[in-house]
Amino acid sequence: DKLASEVILKLKNKNPNIEYLSVGGSNLKNLGIDSIFDLKEITYLGFTSVLFNIFKIRKKINITIKEIIKFNPDILFSVDSPDFTMRVASKVKKINSKIKTIHYVAPQVWVWRKNRVKKIKKFIDHMLLLFDFEKKYFDEENIKNSFVGHPLIEHKNIRTNLDNLIATDKKIISLFPGSRKSEILVLVPILLDFIKIMNIKNYDYSFVFHSTDENKELIVNNVKDSKIENIDVISDDNIKSKILSSSIFAVCKSGTVSLQVCSANVPSIIIYKLNIINFMIFKFLVN
């Protein structure tokens, strides 16, 4: 949703007459983009979660395909979430081959399921890559691709005066529990335990949870229940960037946010937690 909104914003500035239809979240909604349904309705964490909701996901895929064909766009622009977007793109292409398909954020074929590349070229006309090393995987299968870089690297992190934002008399530690509700429910308790341990050793820290607007209340409620005082929860993107740049280190969920932390030159600890079934499945599939 965030990546798509940045692309759409630039397109709107160049051509305000383009019409859009999406499966998006709050960022696209803020740009006035109509959504078939909210992105949260297809956001599931782990293999087992997807398996338990497979019929709901299939229904959403079919609804999305139906609405795309009805909308009859010139371009189907899909972003990340390959297990959803690739299925949609594949079926749309079969129904109407005139619709050009562009996918942004290539599937991580260098990590697992490398053979996906052979299938992708049947329905994706152009792949936009975040990382330069990805090119060889798609060049090998003659899939048209362009290295466009990662938008997070474009964002400059500027150290600034944080007065009135958080407790600036303490050392700042940024915490990133993820954007999915399922991730937050698992990782926030772990991060709160981490804070308790850190406070026993040294209370001279200010811990800041980086949240989305949608998930802020959930994190705030967890923080209140913990009764830990030296914690702030922020959702404003401009403030988050400033606080991250002023942090002594960060603890973050594995994923895109780890690149953001790295680009800010902030040392980090990467965390994640899978249940045992998801762990064993992923261990079997990884390259």
What does each model-found stretch correspond to?
Residues 25-27, 182-246:
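Donor-nucleotide binding loops and adjacent catalytic segments primarily
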Residues 91, 141, 222, 264, ...:
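Residue-level signal for well-ordered alpha-helical positions
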